[in-house]
Amino acid sequence: MSKDIKDIKKDILDQFRAMEGEENDILPENWLIEEYLPFLNPYEKKDFEKAIKQLAAKGFLKYEKGVIPKLKLTEKGANLIH
């Protein structure tokens, strides 16, 4: 079953939750490149970009664009997952 943007946002926040993320914690690159992104189809990979932009627009995380995006939890994001 294909993931939509909502599912991808939930996956990202769930991963921060699983690592008991606090403000300024960064999602481990190895999780993204080894355990998550390889399992997304091309459409889901496009939605991944949209999902992180939406999470950033809502103030839940900050991200630096790159081959592997750097996702950093904000205070608002930390409050959401706890």
Language model features with spans:
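Short, amphipathic alpha-helical interaction segments positioned at domain boundaries
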Residues: K76-H82
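Short acidic, hydrophobic short linear motifs in intrinsically disordered regions
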Residues: E22-F39
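Residue-level marker of regulatory loop/turn positions in helix-turn-helix DNA-binding domains and
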Residues: I5, D25, E44, G66
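Short amphipathic alpha-helical interaction segments
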Residues: N41-A57
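A short, conserved structural fragment
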Residues: A56-G66
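Short alpha-helical segments that sit at the start of domains
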Residues: M1-E23
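Minor-groove-contacting beta-hairpin "wing" of winged helix-turn-helix DNA-binding domains
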Residues: I68-L73
